[in-house]
Amino acid sequence: MSKESSFDIVSKVELAEVNNAIQTALKEIENRFDFKGSKSSISLEKEELVLVSDDDFKLSQVKDILLGKLVKRDVPIKNLDYGKIEPAAGGTVRQRAKLVQGIDKDNAKKINSIIKDTGLKVKTQIQDDQIRVTGKSKDELQQIINAIRKADLPLEVQFINYR
C-alpha cells in the first residue's frame, strides 16, 4: 500500500456566519436598555469589521456582545486582528477588526516547525495561504493534526481535503 494520504491546513472565516452574528448582535444592542439612544453599530466592510459607539466603555460592551455571538456561530475569534480605538464623527469612537483569512508566511513556518518537531515522515508544501501535508500513513497524519491542535497558534486552523 504505497498510496499517499494528504490533507490541507487552512485558516478561513465564514463571512456568512460573521454576517449572521453581526445581525443578532445588532438586535441585542437595539433591545438593551443601556444602549437606548446610543449611536452603537457594527458593520462588515469587505473583510473588516467596524465597531462604532459613544465611548470606550460602550465600545467594549459592543465588542463583548459581538464576540459572544461569533463564538455561538463557531466563528474563530482568534482570526480577528483589532486595530486601535480612534475618534469618529459626532463624538463617537470607532475600532476596526480585520478578519484574517489564510495562513501568512510566519505562521506557515511555525506550523511547519511543529510538524518537523513531531519527527514523523511527512512532507509539507506551503501553497499560497494553505499548507498541504502528505504522508504514507493516515495514523501519522492524525498525529500531525493532534500536534497542531495542541499547539498555541495565533490563529485558528481547519483541516480540509483529508484523503
UniProtKB/Swiss-Prot annotation:
InterPro entries reported in the protein's UniProt record: DUF520, UPF0234-like_C, UPF0234_N, YajQ-like_sf
Gene Ontology CC: cytosol
Gene3D superfamilies linked to this entry: 3.30.70.860, YajQ-like, domain 2
A GO molecular-function descriptor: nucleotide binding
Superkingdom, natural source: Bacteria
This protein's record includes keyword Ion transport: no
Keywords, ordered alphabetically: Nucleotide-binding
Record family assignment: Belongs to the YajQ family.
Annotated function: Nucleotide-binding protein.
Xref: HAMAP family: YajQ
Name the record gives this protein: Nucleotide-binding protein BBR47_25280
UniProt source species: Brevibacillus brevis (strain 47 / JCM 6285 / NBRC 100599)
